[in-house]
Regions:
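N-terminal export signals
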Residues: 1-13
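Immediate post-signal peptide segment of exported/extracytoplasmic ligand-binding proteins
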Residues: 10-48, 141-152
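Pocket-lining segment of extracytoplasmic ligand-binding domains
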Residues: 12, 104-105, 114, 175-272
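Extracytoplasmic
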Residues: 41-45, 55, 71-73, 83-86, ...
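Bilobed "Venus flytrap"/periplasmic-binding protein-like clamshell domains
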Residues: 45-68, 132-189, 193
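Pocket-flanking alpha-helical
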Residues: 65-66, 77-118, 187-190, 196, ...
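Signal peptide-directed extracytoplasmic domains
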Residues: 104-141
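Segments of small-molecule ligand-sensing domains
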Residues: 255-337
Length: 337
């Protein structure tokens, strides 16, 4: 602890050990105190990787921190991320990242592409969150997806869920676009300047990215047909004037498709400290869920059913016993826990 100054004077710093041969000096009290503080600070900390600053993921992660972080027993760190596929990699590989928000189709896609070894055993889910709508905003003069053939279309950064879904969407519909990979706010500026034909953004409506588009811009959302092939993976949805009053006429709606968002988690081995941390997070989420359903929390929380199943995913069991077949633990990442 800190030294106490005698009356009329300043506290003297403790003498430093002299350099020289011999065994290392024993840790000082201050070093031990710092180690204890470090352990205490990390004991209840859970990292949640989200998305870009203009998307819904980051707002959901911020809500998780605002509601569940009590500053003592549980701290929730909301982290900006780069999209679903990168989030899966970050959950598996980055120290301090336990949980991430990803699209429900990301796990199957990453598995098919063999992007990460052992993915199916090391990634589980806590809850299905809500459905995210596919937004395809086009410049004036373009009225259908087929008109995007051969055109420059921004599909977000590589590794993002939007890039993945856009690739699957246009491939399924047989439309060959010229994909661009700018971040979304840059793409919106380029779209307004006529440098690209359209931009694709997968996000829960209403997405903040489009809030600043002024009425009369000429930009418009393109309808996405709910073909049988697309409905094998996605859900039908729509964008209404209530969601985007500057982009959708009053009383009208634009047909589109949606994909589920999932709260993914690393499959920590039961009995480890990291498993206990996530279990505390899950308990707090269940206990405080009602607080997410009222303002100022994001309206998408009202679509969440914590008991909903996610096909193709394994649910994280907060009360799990030791698994019968142990996978290699991620404790070698040396998380400070």
């Amino acid at each position: 602890g800190a030294a106490i100054a005698p009356a009329g004077g300043l506290a003297q710093a403790p003498a430093l050990p002299r350099a020289g041969p011999g065994p290392a000096a024993a840790p000082t009290l201050s070093t031990q105190s710092l180690a204890a503080l470090t352990a205490r600070a990390n004991a209840g900390t859970v990292g949640v990787i989200s998305g870009g600053i203009d998307g819904t993921y980051v707002r959901i992660a911020a809500d998780l921190s605002a509601v569940l972080d009590d500053g003592e027993a549980l701290r929730v760190l909301a982290i900006l991320g780069k999209g679903s596929l990168q989030n899966l990699a970050d959950i598996m590989l980055l120290r301090g990242v336990d949980i991430g928000i990803v699209q429900s189709d990301a796990l199957a896609f990453a598995r098919r592409q063999r992007l990460l070894p052992g993915l199916e055993t090391q990634i589980q889910y806590i809850a299905k969150l809500y459905d995210e709508e596919v937004h395809i905003l086009a410049r004036p003069g373009i009225g259908s997806l087929s008109e995007l053939a051969g055109q420059a279309v921004n599909v977000d950064v590589r590794g993002s869920g939007t890039a993945m879904t856009a690739g699957l969407l246009f491939e399924t519909l047989g439309i060959a676009i010229r994909p661009e990979h700018d971040v979304q706010d840059t793409a919106l500026t380029r779209l307004g300047a006529g440098e690209i034909a359209a931009q694709v953004f997968v996000a829960g409506k209403p997405a903040r990215l489009f809030a600043g588009v002024p009425p009369g811009s000429g930009l418009r959302f393109l309808p996405v047909p709910a073909t049988p092939a697309l409905l094998e993976t996605y859900l039908p949805s729509r964008l209404a004037a209530a969601d985007y009053p500057a982009l959708v006429p009053e009383g009208a709606a634009v047909e589109t498709i949606a994909v589920g968002a999932v709260m993914a988690v690393y499959a920590w081995a039961p009995g480890t400290e990291r498993h206990r941390k996530v279990a505390r997070f899950v308990e707090a989420l269940n206990t405080n869920f009602g607080r997410f359903l009222v303002p100022p929390r994001h309206p998408k929380w009202r679509e969440v059913n914590l008991a909903a199943q996610v096909p193709g995913w394994t649910r994280f069991d907060a009360a799990a016993g030791p698994p019968q077949r142990q996978r290699r633990s991620r404790e070698d990442r040396q998380d400070p826990s």
